[in-house]
Amino acid sequence: MIMSRFSYDVAVAYRIYPKMSVGRPPIFGEDKFKLAELCLKSFKDSLGGLRVKLWALLNDCPPAYESIFTKLWAPEDLVLLRYPGVGAGITLQEQTRILTEQTDAEIVHFAEDDYFYLPGQFHLAVDFLKQNPAADFATPYDHPDQHTTDLHNLFHETRAFGGKTWSSCISTTHTFLAKRAALIESRKLFLKLFQDFEGRTSPDLAMWMALTKKRVFNPVKFFRWSLSHRYWAGSIFLAWYHCWPQILFGRRFTLWAPQPSIATHMVAKLQAPGIDWQKEFQARMAAAGKI
């Protein structure tokens, strides 16, 4: 029997902030603490039997936020890190540093505080990465725009795994899983972008375009989108401006997304398709004794 040299299945760096994001959530729209508590509990329930070490990056958080983590994680599996209201770029740099330097797990997870996970399903993303040598990154989130917009209207490689269809994709948010080796290989790109946008959230679409090398070699789309979809065109520009060495000389990394989704972004207009999320929210709250 071959023993793993890793003591955990997943290493997680979880960013949490006590203020609401720009998009209104589908539940607890006026109470970030309750929203964060629900999301973290859903993440814990999604892990099942996975062995997880978690770093909680508490950015300007009152003490009550720490208690959410200490109630759910054993002290030996939890590291609490406190930041005095720094920009998103700083905590993204910290996530990158933590997850590349740790040697506890070969699969790592960049987590944000506004994602809700389905119970017992997170292992599917972990197993998908472990069992697919060509997969570098994975998102637990089936983005609704993957199915409806011109940006994502291109060939996708698909693989059936764990009762889901996994598709290669262009981009995701700052919530994603990675093989530690792939993250180490792309570390310079991550840190450069996060440093360049230190006080703000870095441009995730531009970052993923540079890594996956999708949509960055199509000048026709660039000029067309410059008129109709400036965010897409602007992301292509930012990818070239900040990440041109990766685009020209780096290898093409792969990013995969599941359908149906494993998690959803807690923005009312951006929920993953095909799942009754309100039903899932109510079920999680009932299980936790919240209703």
Tell where the protein language model's regions lie, with residue ranges.
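N-proximal low-complexity "stem/linker" segments adjacent to membrane-targeting elements
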Residues: 1-45
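C-terminal catalytic/acceptor-binding lobe
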Residues: 5-7, 180-181, 185-291
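Short loop->beta transition adjacent to catalytic acidic/histidine clusters or analogous donor-positioning motifs
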Residues: 10, 46-55, 78-79, 106
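Short loop/turn segments at strand-loop or loop-helix junctions that form parts
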Residues: 10-21, 59-60, 140-143, 258-262
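Phosphate/oxyanion-binding active-site loops and adjacent basic polyanion-contact surfaces
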Residues: 28-39, 84-92, 117, 172, ...
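Active-site-proximal specificity loops/subdomain of glycosyltransferases
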Residues: 62-106
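Short beta-strand-to-loop acidic/aromatic patch adjacent to the donor-nucleotide binding site
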Residues: 105-116
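Conserved catalytic core of nucleotide-sugar-dependent glycosyltransferases
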Residues: 116-193
